[in-house]
Amino acid sequence: MVAEAKPFIERYGIKKVEGFFSPLPCELYEGEVNGATLNVVLNGQQQDSDLIGCEAASVATLSAIQRLHPDIVVNSGTCGGFQKNGADIAEVFIGNEVMFHDRRVPGDNTWGTQSLGNYPVWEGSQALAKALGMKMGKVTTGSSLDMQPCDLEIIEKHGGELKDMEGAAVGFVCSLFHTPILYVKSVTDLCDSGAETFEEFSRNLHKACESLKVANEKVIDYLVNNLHA
């Protein structure tokens, strides 16, 4: 979303590349950080609102990898967390695993296993989190902002901690291209707080995006220094 990316874009002063993905709605912002190329890709907009969810994220990721050939993809955005796991509003986590939580397909080791995803994350994620003093958690993805009891059942069964709407879709595309992916997630709402999800999300979005900006700066500096050393 623009709200998630804008503070980061403004921090680095990177510029929009008009029409790069045309006719697709995805948007590219490009710049340089300490000699490394930094590309920020947004899903784009339709009907005057940000495109969110798995479909838009898949299109943007596929297009970006095919056109830009990145060394690593960073899926940076907001998420829901759980009080019982120690999450706080605007706290930023690094993802250590990723899967879908709303694909209810029977059949272990066939469609059921495939539908959950469990795609690989960048092997350097743990070292980065340790170096930056950030917690880690398992990202689970669904196509709705709220969470149904059946979603929670899957999340708890598989140890999910960070609930979003795009992460596993991005991970799926990255797995097809064998492109490393790093997850950086800032908490906007606490799924077990009893508060209405959209209201809590809206109330905390700005705060979460500001903390995400700070974390992104640290992450980019780390990646530039370690991937291009």
What are these regions (language model features)?
Residues 1-119:
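Metabolite-binding pocket within alpha/beta catalytic cores that recognizes anionic/polar moieties
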Residues 3, 52-59, 68, 165-168, ...:
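Conserved active-site and cofactor/substrate-binding residues in soluble primary-metabolism enzymes
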Residues 33-37, 68, 128-134, 170-179, ...:
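A structural motif corresponding to the C-terminal end of an alpha-helix
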Residues 60, 64, 122-125, 208-219:
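Short, well-ordered amphipathic alpha-helical segments that serve as non-catalytic structural scaffolds
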Residues 80, 98, 143, 188-190:
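Glycine-rich beta-alpha junction loops
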Residues 107-162, 168-177:
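Active-site rim beta-loop-alpha module in soluble metabolic enzymes
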Residues 154-163, 168-206:
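Active-site-adjacent mobile loop/cap segments within catalytic or ligand-binding domains
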Residues 193-229:
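His/Asp/Glu-rich mid-to-C-terminal helical/loop segments that flank catalytic regions of hydrolases
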